[in-house]
């Protein structure tokens, strides 16, 4: 699978052929550092002074490289696909090899950093349910409304917790229909592309 870069990202990466390969390698190190600790304007300013360019140019170059490395790592694209994705940018063969080496050296670490940044959401463990109906009452003059009680067991970071929910059957039926509709929508090509890019 090829990585598709927007025109903006191509513009950001267009700065890389203008600098030495050691500078590109340093930009790669800064890009991984950017993922670990966030942006550091002092590093951009120092590099900009050494290269006699604006700090925005350096920042855009690092951000473009960060995007290239993170998206490639996220999608776990192969060496060949990475080379083909970078080939479209029109860089020299030496720069393409350097970018490939940066990707191969850092992809495991980048995936680890991205997994740490992902939010930890509760996951389903078990479900118990009960239908409550009042069978008889002398004082009851309106129609009997049954209630569905649901006990939901969840796991989050090894901790177990329980949520108790209660609703009427009509609302539960509507909820089931909405969930089934969402599951059907997940089978569309658009949703599959989105999910593939999220991973």
UniProtKB/Swiss-Prot annotation:
Entry keyword Cytoplasm: yes
Residue stretches making up the COMM domain: 123-190
Broad class of the protein's primary localization: cytoplasm
GO CC term, one of those recorded: cytoplasm
Database matches in Pfam families: COMM_domain (PF07258), COMM_HN (PF21672)
InterPro entries xrefs: COMM, Commd2
Compartment(s): Cytoplasm
Keywords tagged on the record: Cytoplasm, Transcription, Transcription regulation, Ubl conjugation pathway
Function: Scaffold protein in the commander complex that is essential for endosomal recycling of transmembrane cargos; the commander complex is composed of the CCC subcomplex and the retriever subcomplex. May modulate activity of cullin-RING E3 ubiquitin ligase (CRL) complexes. May down-regulate activation of NF-kappa-B.
Assembly: Component of the commander complex consisting of the CCC subcomplex and the retriever subcomplex. Component of the CCC (COMMD/CCDC22/CCDC93) subcomplex consisting of COMMD1, COMMD2, COMMD3, COMMD4, COMMD5, COMMD6, COMMD7, COMMD8, COMMD9, COMMD10, CCDC22 and CCDC93; within the complex forms a heterodimer with COMMD3. Interacts with RELA, RELB, NFKB1/p105, NFKB2/p100. Interacts with CCDC22, CCDC93, SCNN1B, CUL3, CUL4B, CUL5, CUL7.
Similarity comment text for this entry: Belongs to the COMM domain-containing protein 2 family.
Protein name (Swiss-Prot/TrEMBL): COMM domain-containing protein 2
Organism: Pongo abelii
Gene that specifies this protein: COMMD2
């Amino acid at each position: 699978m090829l990585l598709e870069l927007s025109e903006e990202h191509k513009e950001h990466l267009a700065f890389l052929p203008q600098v030495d390969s050691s500078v590109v390698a340093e930009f790669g190190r800064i890009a991984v550092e950017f993922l670990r600790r966030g942006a550091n304007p002092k590093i951009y300013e120092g590099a900009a002074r050494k290269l006699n360019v604006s700090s925005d140019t350096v920042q855009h170059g690092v951000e473009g490289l960060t995007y290239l490395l993170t998206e490639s790592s996220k999608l776990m694209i192969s060496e060949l696909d990475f080379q083909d994705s970078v080939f479209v940018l029109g860089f020299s063969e030496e720069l393409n090899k350097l970018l490939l080496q940066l990707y191969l050296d850092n992809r495991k670490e980048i995936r680890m950093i991205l997994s740490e940044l992902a939010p930890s959401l509760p996951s389903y463990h078990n479900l118990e349910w009960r239908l409550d109906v009042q069978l008889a009452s002398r004082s009851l003059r309106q129609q009997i409304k049954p209630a569905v009680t649901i006990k939901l067991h969840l796991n989050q970071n090894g901790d177990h917790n329980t949520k108790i929910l209660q609703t009427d059957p009509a609302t539960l039926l509507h909820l089931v229909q909405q969930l089934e509709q969402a599951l059907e929508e997940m089978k569309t090509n658009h949703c599959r592309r989105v999910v593939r890019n999220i991973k």
